[in-house]
Amino acid sequence: MVYAIVRAGGRQEKVSVGDLVTLDRVAGEAGSTVELPALLLVDGDKVTSDSKTLADVKVTAEIIEDLRGPKISIMKYKNKTGYKKRQGFRAELTTVKITGIDA
């Protein structure tokens, strides 16, 4: 089984061909392809972590859809002063399908 550890949106994700992965927003339209940088490659028993070898490894993914994450509520409150502040946040996300790991 071939899998790779890729850097995407400041995080590291373990991916293999055919996986659907949700990442921070990636620039591009649905149906277009993006290339993710590999940090580690495992091909059966062979593990590759050398940066010179990994420069040739291409992990390609197809953008499936853009979406927004769940709403996160942020509440600030100070006792006895009447101060309270409410704020919400939804992360901009992209779902991608890994189409190939070429070493």
Swiss-Prot record:
Name the UniProt record assigns to this protein: Large ribosomal subunit protein bL21
Keyword Ribonucleoprotein: yes
Family matches, as InterPro entries: bL21-like, bL21-like_sf, Ribosomal_bL21
UniProt keywords, alphabetically: Ribonucleoprotein, Ribosomal protein, RNA-binding, rRNA-binding
Keyword RNA-binding on entry: yes
Role summary: This protein binds to 23S rRNA in the presence of protein L20.
Native species: Kocuria rhizophila (strain ATCC 9341 / DSM 348 / NBRC 103217 / DC2201)
Superkingdom of origin: Bacteria
GO biological process, one term: translation
Molecular function per GO: rRNA binding; structural constituent of ribosome
Cited PANTHER family: 50S RIBOSOMAL PROTEIN L21, LARGE RIBOSOMAL SUBUNIT PROTEIN BL21M
Family according to the record: Belongs to the bacterial ribosomal protein bL21 family.
One term under GO cellular component: cytoplasm
SUBUNIT field: Part of the 50S ribosomal subunit. Contacts protein L20.
